[in-house]
């Protein structure tokens, strides 16, 4: 069996494994390991369930801070990630696969630490103490203090006594107390007494462990009942808020429906008003276009009358000697000198009585061109009438 000083020197040469969680709650565990184990190389172990991308990035940032702390304390460190549902089983698997000789982990969360704390409180730590290979030395710390140390057994027939924070001794293999029948004790009668004390201590710790497990089960049961009541209360509150929200939503929908109905009525009224205005506009446009056409005809008739008057004046001056009526004074229908000349739509001037008789007889065409008249309105040819009257007056004077 290797001496105690030789065993300690061998442990110092091994890499120190430090188990940490997904937050900075195990920072004190890492600091204690660097300051008290004497190791120069450290391996930070993190066991986790399969993570989503955002959770993985967040966890990686926290683990990087652990590595940064190692660099600040001038020690070499690496990181190991283990994907497993059970944290404690993941650590046991790591110890077995890598033949880990030294491990530092938390005995409980820092918030549960007290000066009276003399044993492990974490179910994970208790499980690892019982199930870890006997060749691994494990320190259990809490808030920067050593709570329990499980010494390693370097051979199949050798025993190491692990000193706890309370000063008690125990012999352990794979985390559980080694049965006395597996070893031959050759230290005299005193060893028999020590074995009896050890067996009693074993029974005491097993009873304490069972009591602790029972307390944990009761605690988890009470917490589950409490969470169930909280969830039920939250569900009822959410149901109440949902009903209130549905009522508010119903009121808003009714209000919106009413506003939509009013808006549709206003739109219909506006559309009808626009249609009326459009009809009035179309009628006004039609009347204006017709008035413009009539104005153009009047202007055309006026221009023609002016030309005819000028020609008549010339004709009168030429025919003063003969005293015969000019052709323009003669009605194309009655072939007599016109007394009341009227300008028709075809641009010709007729005796009022003759053209009226023509139109009243159902004719819609021009007596001169035989084309359809645009309208049947007659316009007095005042200029021609004035010229005829002058001619008649002049003829009367000439006869006298």
From Swiss-Prot:
Provide one Gene Ontology biological process annotation: protein ubiquitination
Coiled coil regions, renumbered to chain: 229-298
CDD domains according to UniProt: RING-Ubox_WDSUB1-like, USP_STK_Ubox_N
The reaction(s) annotated as catalysed by this protein in its Swiss-Prot or TrEMBL entry are:
S-ubiquitinyl-[E2 ubiquitin-conjugating enzyme]-L-cysteine + [acceptor protein]-L-lysine = [E2 ubiquitin-conjugating enzyme]-L-cysteine + N(6)-ubiquitinyl-[acceptor protein]-L-lysine
Give its E.C. classification number. 2.3.2.27
Spell out the InterPro entries in the cross-references.
U-box_ubiquitin_ligases, Ubox_domain, Znf_RING/FYVE/PHD
Provide an example Pfam family for this protein. Answer: U-box
UniProt keyword DNA damage, yes or no: no
Q: Which residues form the U-box domain?
A: 324-398
Q: Which UniProt keywords apply?
A: Coiled coil, Transferase, Ubl conjugation pathway
Endpoints of the signal sequence: none
Q: What pathway annotation does it carry?
A: Protein modification; protein ubiquitination
The record's GO molecular-function terms, alphabetically, read: ubiquitin-protein transferase activity
Q: What does this protein do?
A: Functions as an E3 ubiquitin ligase.
Query: What is the protein name stated in its UniProt record?
Result: U-box domain-containing protein 37
């Amino acid at each position: 069996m290797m001496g105690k000083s030789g065993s300690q020197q061998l442990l110092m040469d091994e890499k120190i494994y430090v188990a940490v969680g997904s937050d900075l709650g195990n920072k004190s565990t890492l600091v204690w390991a660097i300051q008290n184990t004497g190791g120069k190389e450290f391996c930070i172990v993190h066991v986790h369930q399969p993570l989503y991308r955002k959770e993985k990035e967040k966890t990686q940032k926290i683990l990087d801070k652990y590595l940064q702390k190692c660099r600040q304390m001038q020690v070499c460190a690496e990181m190991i990630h283990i994907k497993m549902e059970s944290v404690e089983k993941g650590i046991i698997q790591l110890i077995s696969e890598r033949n880990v000789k030294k491990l530092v982990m938390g005995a409980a969360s820092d918030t549960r630490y007290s000066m009276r704390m003399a044993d492990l409180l974490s179910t994970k730590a208790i499980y690892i103490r019982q199930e870890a290979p006997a060749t691994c030395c494990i320190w259990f710390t809490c808030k920067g203090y050593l709570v329990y140390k499980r010494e390693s057994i370097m051979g199949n027939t050798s025993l190491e006594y692990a000193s706890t924070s309370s000063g008690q001794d125990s012999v352990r293999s794979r985390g559980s107390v080694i049965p006395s029948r597996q070893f031959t004790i050759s230290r005299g009668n005193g060893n028999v007494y020590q074995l009896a004390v050890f067996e009693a201590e074993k029974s005491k710790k097993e009873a304490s462990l069972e009591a602790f497990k029972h307390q944990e089960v009761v605690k988890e049961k009470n917490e589950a009942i409490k969470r169930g009541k909280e969830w039920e209360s939250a569900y009822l509150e959410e149901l109440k808020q949902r009903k209130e929200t549905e009522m508010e939503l119903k009121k808003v929908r009714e209000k919106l429906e009413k506003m939509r109905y009013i808006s549709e009525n206003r739109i219909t009224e506006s559309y009808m008003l626009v249609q009326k205005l459009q009809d009035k506009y179309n009628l006004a446009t039609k009347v204006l276009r017709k008035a413009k056409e009539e104005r153009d005809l009047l202007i055309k008739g006026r221009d023609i009358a002016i030309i005819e008057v000028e020609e008549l004046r010339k004709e009168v001056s030429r025919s003063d000697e003969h005293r015969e009526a000019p052709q323009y004074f003669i009605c194309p229908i009655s072939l007599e000198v016109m007394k009341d000349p009227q300008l028709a739509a075809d641009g010709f001037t007729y005796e009022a009585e003759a053209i009226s008789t023509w139109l009243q007889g159902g004719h819609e065409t021009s007596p001169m061109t035989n084309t359809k008249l645009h309208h049947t309105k007659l316009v007095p040819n005042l200029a021609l009438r004035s010229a005829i009257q002058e001619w008649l007056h002049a003829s009367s004077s000439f006869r006298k």
